[in-house]
A protein has these predicted regions:
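Conserved double-stranded beta-helix
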Residues: 2-39, 44, 229-278, 282-341
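Short, conserved beta-strand element in jelly-roll/cupin
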Residues: 191, 198-216, 264-265, 272, ...
Length: 341
């Protein structure tokens, strides 16, 4: 007689979870692998359309570009441009407070973003190789070793917007994050960052900076409108093994007629979303990588939560030597606005 429990196929997520994390349904333990493996796991939690064979569409091979050298004069121009204050309107601040997100046009010079895209692509290739099986490539803390990335991540212009949207006097950097959704990669699951970031504060927001125009078929970041929308689903249990949590979230938003902004991004347009803002991203159905740089800022004085979970990924690398309950002020969390440089 066959034991039917042994014949059940394991969830796709098991490929990326450690044995210890496979054996428990909760998320209380901390993540015990690197952040690329975290993304490999996390992307399995999205509800996706499948091909006729019942499998998620596999990513196409990467299209590689030669790295581009940037001279000191161009770097200085980029740094200067990213230091110019941005005139944020009262209407934009009001929308952010109401909807939990804002998309702002013409924040960054498109040519500067093209250079950044080439640089980040080179960084990802150096870090991860050219393996076509990676549907979603990521890297963090790039600002520590790349001058061009550092100008963007520590930009006074971008951090000023974050500070004014949050209504706080000063913001620090949590971390940078290169996000490359490859051709054929599926959806990013619905989530809100308060569930992810181990920061004991609501004054947290993320700038999402597309590195190319993102039409709807490329999977732009999409937002469930309403700063209080999270209340509809705050008691919904998270499932770390399959897409049921993501599927239920989408259904609840639809049943409650929550508006979803899934419009395109022009090059130079960036978004900011609050830590309580639910967001997702569609599949990349083009033949190009959908690349973005995300930088997260938090109010100066915020502390590390008492019990970080696996959903926070490899958070220790973003705030070395910071213990639960400590103020987050490591050398990797500089004050980005106001700054004295």
């Amino acid at each position: 007689m066959t034991d039917s429990t042994n014949s059940q196929p394991k969830p796709e997520s098991f490929e990326y979870l450690s044995k210890a994390q496979q054996q428990s349904e909760d998320v209380a333990s901390q993540w015990d692998q690197d952040n690329q493996q975290w993304w490999n796991w996390y992307m399995t939690l999205a509800e996706n359309e499948h091909d006729q064979n019942g499998r998620a569409v596999k990513p196409a091979p990467l299209s590689l570009q030669a790295p581009v050298e940037i001279d000191e004069s161009t770097l200085a121009q980029i740094q200067d441009a990213l230091s110019v204050p941005y005139k944020l309107s009262a209407d934009s601040i009001e929308q952010f407070g109401r909807d939990g997100y804002i998309k702002l046009k013409n924040v960054i010079d498109p040519e500067h973003l093209r250079l950044l895209r080439q640089r980040i692509n080179s960084i990802l290739i150096d870090a991860l190789g050219t393996e076509s099986g990676l549907a979603f490539r990521s890297d963090e803390m790039m600002w520590l070793h790349d001058e061009l990335v550092r100008h963007f991540v520590l930009s006074k212009r971008i951090a000023q917007i974050a500070s004014e949207l949050l209504g706080v006097q000063a913001v620090r950097l949590y971390h940078d994050n290169a996000l490359s959704k490859e051709p054929g990669c599926g959806r990013t699951p619905w989530h809100y960052d308060y569930h992810h970031f181990p920061i004991d504060s609501l004054n947290v927001c993320t700038a999402w900076i597309p590195l190319q125009t993102i039409p709807s078929e490329m999977g732009p970041l999409a937002f469930a409108a309403g700063i209080d929308t999270y209340k509809l689903v705050k008691d919904l249990p998270f499932n770390k093994f399959d897409s049921s949590y993501d599927k239920q979230l989408g259904q609840i938003f639809a049943d409650n007629h929550v508006p979803v902004d899934d419009g395109r991004f022009d090059l130079g347009e960036i978004s900011f979303h609050h830590t309580l803002s639910f967001h997702t991203a569609g599949a990349n159905r083009t033949n190009e990588s959908r690349m973005a740089l995300a930088t997260t800022y938090f109010e100066d004085g915020a502390r590390l939560v008492s019990s970080p979970t696996m959903i926070s990924g490899e958070f220790h690398k973003f705030m070395p030597a910071i213990e639960p309950g400590d103020i987050i002020n490591s050398e990797y969390n500089p004050v980005c606005y106001p700054n004295t440089d």
